[in-house]
Amino acid sequence: MWVADMDFRTASAVTEALKKRVEHGIFGYVRVPDSYYHAVVHWFGRRHYWKIEREWIIYTTGVVPALSAIIKALTNPSDRVLVQTPVYNCFFSSIRNNGCEMISNPLIYEDNTYRIDFDDLEKKAADPKVKLLLLCNPHNPAGRVWSKQELIRIGEICLRNDVWVVSDEIHCELVFPGHTYTPFASLSEEFRMHSVTCTSPSKAFNLAGLQIANIISAAVSYTHLRA
């Protein structure tokens, strides 16, 4: 799951748009067009029933640099960050590079699947040094698509303990029939105002080389991330 290198060609609509850009012949500084933001808003609203605002979206070059910037904005050196191991290894370096301590909430492997140890999560989230949870939804590498009930329980624990949820949702389009991806921030106003979501078309649409990703948050602005 961690390698965004597909065995199929990128969609013709993408390759045709790239050809048009190449034919333009000038590759100086560019501004992200409004049409990009409208496409993101439309996609999540139509496909995932998540109503987001244009102002919530920050364009970025990748989810990994986005995670690092968010951790820097929401923590101080020596703060603690929760992760649900086993998990994408770049989570660890993003935490460490910001001078924070990684705290593991290990997933429980049982009956050929993984589940969250909520008792352990409750205990560790209560530590006042824990400032945020890096959530992977759907989870990489476990392959779990967290249910609404699981996400609500995570959110309630984090709200009670004033822990931010930073949700990496890059795999949201890679969901098998019979399972439903739910954006964490879509579940309540409280969750939306205490979370940051990271998305990208790179995994599902074979676009990793184009370096396109989004930070989506009603609570954290571009100004916060630059501070």
Enumerate the language-model features and the residues they cover.
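Walker B catalytic acidic pair
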Residues: 169
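Conserved small/polar residues in nucleotide/adenosyl-binding loops
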Residues: 223-227
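N-terminal "arm"/small-domain region of PLP-dependent enzymes with the aminotransferase-like
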Residues: 1-28
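Residue-level marker for buried hydrophobic side chains located in beta-strands
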Residues: 137, 165-166
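A general structural signal for well-ordered alpha-helical segments in protein cores
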Residues: 11, 15, 36-37, 151, ...
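Active-site PLP attachment segment
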Residues: 187-222
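The start of beta-strands in P-loop NTPase/AAA+ ATPase cores
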Residues: 131, 162-164
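Conserved core of the PLP fold type I
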Residues: 27-156, 173-174, 181-192, 196
